[in-house]
Amino acid sequence: MLFCDDSKKYLKEQNINLKNEFDKDDKRVEKFSLKHQNIYFDYSKNLINDYILKSLLESAEKSSLKDKIKQMFNGAKINSTEHRAVLHTALRDLSSTPLIVDGQDIRQEVTKEKQRVKELVEKVVSGRWRGFSGKKITDIVNIGIGGSDLGPKMVVRALQPYHCTDLKVHFVSNVDADSLLQALHVVDPETTLFIIASKSFSTEETLLNSISAREWLLDHYEDEKAVANHFVAISSKLDKVKEFGIDLEHCYKMWDWVGGRYSLWSSIGMSIAFAIGYDNFEKLLAGAYSVDKHFKETEFSKNIPVIMALLASYYSCTYNSQSQALLPYDERLCYFVDYLQQADMESNGKSVNIAGETVNYQTGVVLWGGVGTNGQHAFHQLLHQGNIFIPVDFIAIATSHHNYDNHQQALLANCFAQSQALMFGQSYDMVYNELLKSGLNETQAKELAAHKVIPGNRPSTTILLDELSPYSLGVLIALYEHKIFVQGVLWDINSYDQWGVELGKKLGKNILKAMNDDSSDEYQNLDDSTRQLIAKVKNK
């Protein structure tokens, strides 16, 4: 059964008024909220009632979702266009049951690789790993892009209060040299260890940054042997790693069944472990594993990722929602939106179904947002008074790591107030009467009132964590990962390929050749606009 069929459009005719729904049902919050571990999921401020939720759940039951969940966890090749399993969940699976992929028990492989990463982290932290000159390592520079950067960077920042190793961790991703130079300006070549995170060891941005970092190191040492003491790699291309000068003993595995945007649980998370210690890294994995079990074993009506996906898909199909705002009310989650943008938009930004047929319904949305309370002084105006339908996810942390309780209370009060304002708004009469009470005369009040009306009845979900710990962050990330998967199933698309990014890469290589040789075929085949842009650059 296709989720985005015409029947969903009739649900909109329920004409949900959130204020009325709360007034007439004192059990609404109890009915439309869930709890998992230390996370409370309140979806009571969404445009649903019992009938709508029942209809959405029935659609999920009639879909292939149950089978797809089993297939994913059992190692079926649900990434159909690349003929790959999707098993980032295996990286955090604490069970010992064999899991066979292409004739091999990957559980044993994962356990072995985790141990290798743990040993490296402990070796560097303890000082047993030394730089070429014999000095202890003080700085880690992770060179990667996309999933090899966004996930680890987000986690390292989010868990800053858990940093316990005295190692400073830096991230370099953009091909713009400024990204690399920001790191190189603050590190010492004699005490820096670089991580090259690239499955193919040929990603343009990562390779160029790595080559420049290598040159920077050798400018100091003037000895090729120094590379082995200052570089490790995470890649599946051993020949290229060896050619770079990295000891293969210090090359860590990337498997085809782990997509880049779901790779922070793998050796790609090495930079996380360098910051928070391997024990805390394991707690991050354990939190995600608890959600995997919840997702696999919980009926849909109480399954948080399923409810998240049903709501988002419902708004997309029925309200033509093209946008989703994500508002974490915690500065430590300042990179969380960037991370989820890739996870969500690269996964579900598709226009053909699994069979390769063009779909006639909307799939992925633009995910955007920023930390509170900053957003209140920037883009919240659009959320409250704009005429675009934008569902909102609020993320809040009940207790903080610091002792500034007045700050934390103000932060939470603002978060809850924003969700309440989106729900209730304020009518013309309310505004008009308030303006009269403030001292304006009737004419002045009438002139201003229309500009201060806030429609309200705008949907939001609030996710409240007891604390932001390695375990709870693992829970939060995994909830969104599985939400993305469920949406892909409901829309009948492949959430685990990303062919849309390939054309730009290919054209970029052609244009680079054209910029260096205007007699080349690549230059001759350019459009006039691109030729002019190249000419403008060359004339500067």
UniProtKB/Swiss-Prot annotation:
CDD domains: SIS_PGI_1 (cd05015), SIS_PGI_2 (cd05016)
Cellular compartments per GO CC: cytosol
Keyword annotations from UniProtKB, A to Z: Cytoplasm, Gluconeogenesis, Glycolysis, Isomerase
GO MF annotations, alphabetized: carbohydrate derivative binding; glucose-6-phosphate isomerase activity; monosaccharide binding
BP terms from Gene Ontology: gluconeogenesis; glucose 6-phosphate metabolic process; glycolytic process
HAMAP family: G6P_isomerase (MF_00473)
Name of the protein in its database record: Glucose-6-phosphate isomerase
Native organism: Francisella tularensis subsp. tularensis (strain WY96-3418)
